[in-house]
Amino acid sequence: MSEKRILLGNEAIARGAYEAGVKVSAAYPGTPSTEVSESLVQYDEIYAEWAPNEKVATEVAIGASIAGVRSMCVMKHVGMNVAADPLYTAAYTGVRGGLVLVVADDPGMYSSQNEQDSRMVARAAMVPIVEPSDSAEAKEFMKYAYDLSEKYDTPVILRSTTRLSHSQGLVELEERVEPFDIPYERDMAKYVMMPGNAIKRHVVVEARMKQMAEDANSLPINRVEYNDLSVGFITNGIAYQYVKEAMPQASVLKLGLLNPLPRKLIEEFAARVDKLYIFEELEPVVEEQVKSWGIKKAVGKEIFTVQGEYSANLIRERVLGQVSQVDKAAKVPARPPILCPGCPHRSVYAVLNKLKIHAAGDIGCYTLGAVAPLSVIDTTICMGASISTLHGMEKAKGREYIKNWVAVIGDSTFMHTGINSLMNMVYNQATGTVIILDNSTTGMTGHQDHAATGKTLKGQVVPAINIYGLCRSLGIEHVCEVDAFDQAELERVIKEEVARDAVSVIITKAPCALLKGIKFPNKCRPLPDKCKKCGACLRPGCPALTKNEDGTISIDETMCNGCGLCKQLCKFDAINLVKAGE
């Protein structure tokens, strides 16, 4: 007997993997994809892991596929760049057990450094990509993706977006189907991509895509809804929901398979409607192909933006000419994103700011060190780039140029792609200083474990990678660990290491203030009679502190966790540490 539940899109994707008989999953956390892997933990039949990065995760999934079982890897859109190397070659080798890459794009860049469109990667890699429009489809499309993968001997990408991943919908749960484990047979010509084999496999890939393009015209995930023929929309994913909301009587061609496109189906649809709109978020992937076929009536990015998320109001405004009736937002004080109360990164940045040291930044909570009042991060490119960026600066301008620079990187990001960058500094005789902000978690995406925390995705306790020992093993003589909240020691060590003519690493250690199980026995309490109204305690921007009208400060004890940073900064002993509850 089936059961229905309300699930997030990401939860539905995980459920689809379970019902499809997936046995192995690997991922690196990244919003908006993270909950897919976290939702897999409940299924004992699936081995699920956090890998150090998306390339490794993809290779793990490929290995499981070659062994003959259904497998998957999960990542956000920028993670696809890291996974590109194995993905492009896996398109040539094909699969044994079904292989699906779940990729979550981020229109609007709610938590990302760019707005790239994974459909373009699928075209370049010559692999099919499917995209659901709600939670129910997310589950079903996941199962269908495995059928496509095994039928056409190819990896398949399932694309989600932030709005789909984090929206809820009603999903009918079904039983798991255990697929037959395919016996292993050595096939060097298929799986060993030396040039002679790869040349032949490229021919196979081209033939496969040609066959899929023909079959796409009759696939059930490409659906035509004929209604009012005066206007028609070609759309996909969450954008389909906006079309149905804004113009429910319009005819719609809903594309579930975005590569390859069903040309015959599209041409037939275009011929039957008077006006044709192509409504797709981000890049004109469908539009460019449709127009290349000579369908001149198609209208897309001429009126719809390539930036950000779409909405039903966008259709009402651009197609119907309506003025959207949107209530004006109340005027409230701006609340820019800031580090949490008690965040150890704030303490480190307070010292860097005091010493007027610039930082090459990386991806994580600590990117917030770029904004006022801390204002120490000058660059942020991608995962692991802080170390390489600092190295490039030194090689371009010399040692003197970086004497007031450091690279800052989190523990999880260091494990992701920072190690190679640090190795490069050692190998090529750099002299920069790297600060590893070790808060014992992958903080920004929701406190996931990694190789240096000693715990797996499934909660198994394992030996933790020792970051100090790892850095020393690279041949770095000057590696030190410092309490992230010890302002005096931080200042001393940073001054010493930045002046050193050799690669050095400072590991600042203190757990993320939001980690479960972290105890905060103390609170900070101001002493107004001693306060000199200098504002030194306010400079790091802790949200628990506010300035009173008379120039003294107040500390919100519901927010304060007693990290003691403000107390250390006060030269007049105008802040006390007290036991929580006193």
Regions found by a protein language model. Name each.
Residues D106-P155, T161, V192, G196, ...:
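Conserved thiamine diphosphate
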Residues V36-S39, I62, A83-L87, M109-Q116, ...:
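Short acidic, glycine/serine/threonine-rich loops at helix termini
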Residues S2-N10, P132-L339, P344, V348, ...:
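Flexible, low-complexity linker and terminal segments
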Residues M1-S135, R163, Y226-N227, E287, A370-I507, G517-I518, ...:
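Thiamine diphosphate
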Residues S39-E45, V243-L253, G469-G475:
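Short helix-loop-beta junction
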Residues E45-P52, T93-A104, R186-A189, Y427-S440, ...:
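A glycine-rich helix N-cap at a beta->alpha junction
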